[in-house]
A protein has these predicted regions:
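Short glycine/threonine-rich loop-to-helix capping motif typified by GTGT followed
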Residues: 110-117
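Peripheral docking tails and interdomain loops at the edges
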Residues: 1-30, 36-46, 117-209
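Short glycine-cluster motifs
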Residues: 18-98, 102-105, 114
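Short, small-residue-enriched loops and turns at beta-alpha junctions
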Residues: 107-110, 137-139
């Protein structure tokens, strides 16, 4: 049931993919590895950043971070909003990535809700889904319900369900569109015979029209 609700939210909020690559930007190296493992298990591509993207990451992230994909911003990002903005802009500008996964590893009323609000403009600006991987055990904690209630953010409470949702999203948009069925014979005549707006027909009269 959780998978149904979360995947429905993804389909309702996400536009058509612009690319198949999955970007992961995280303040926690462990959460990034967990995300990468689940993506790899489902065959989701995680291309490494283009040279121009990597240059921005390397100039912004501490030496003990990872200017790659997954992109480990380290906990320093909490004290350096400029670093967060530069890395998010760089990863979302990279044409290889069609969505961006952000693991949320803690739940705090002020900072977590603030982070969710900070993420919203990126989704609107780049037209790519921002998908929150909610890791705290406090499933309805501050920030979670906020993310679910806004149109720009998509939240999953399981990394496995999140990556499966992305795979289904890709599969749906990969379908070959079929031509619409031909209208049945006599449709035009039947429509012309319909009474005017507001008419009430008995059952036999309605059946006789079709």
């Amino acid at each position: 049931f959780d998978a149904l609700l979360e995947t429905a939210s993804l389909f309702a909020k996400a536009p058509k993919p612009t690319a198949k690559g999955v970007a992961i930007v995280t303040p926690s190296g462990g959460a990034g590895i967990m995300a990468a493992d689940h993506a790899e298990a489902l065959g989701l591509p995680m291309p490494q950043p283009l040279p121009a993207t990597e240059a921005v990451l390397r100039s912004s992230i501490p030496d003990f971070g990872a200017p790659r994909n997954p992109c480990d911003l380290t906990a320093q990002v909490a004290a350096n909003p400029q670093m967060f903005d530069a890395c998010m802009e760089a990863m979302l500008s990279d044409p290889q990535y069609g969505c961006l996964v952000v693991p949320q590893v803690y739940s705090h009323f002020q900072t977590t809700v603030g982070r969710m609000e900070q993420l919203r403009p990126y989704a609107a600006k780049f037209g790519k889904p921002l998908i929150i991987a909610w890791i705290p055990e406090q499933l309805e904690g501050p920030g979670a319900c906020h993310a679910e209630s806004v149109p720009e953010l998509i939240l999953f409470r399981s990394m496995r369900r999140l990556m499966q949702g992305i795979r289904l999203w890709h599969d749906y948009h990969d379908r070959v569109e079929e031509a619409p069925p031909a209208p049945p014979a006599g449709l035009d005549a039947a429509l012309a015979a319909l009474p005017g707006k507001g008419a009430v027909l008995m059952e036999a009269e309605a059946k006789a029209l079709f």
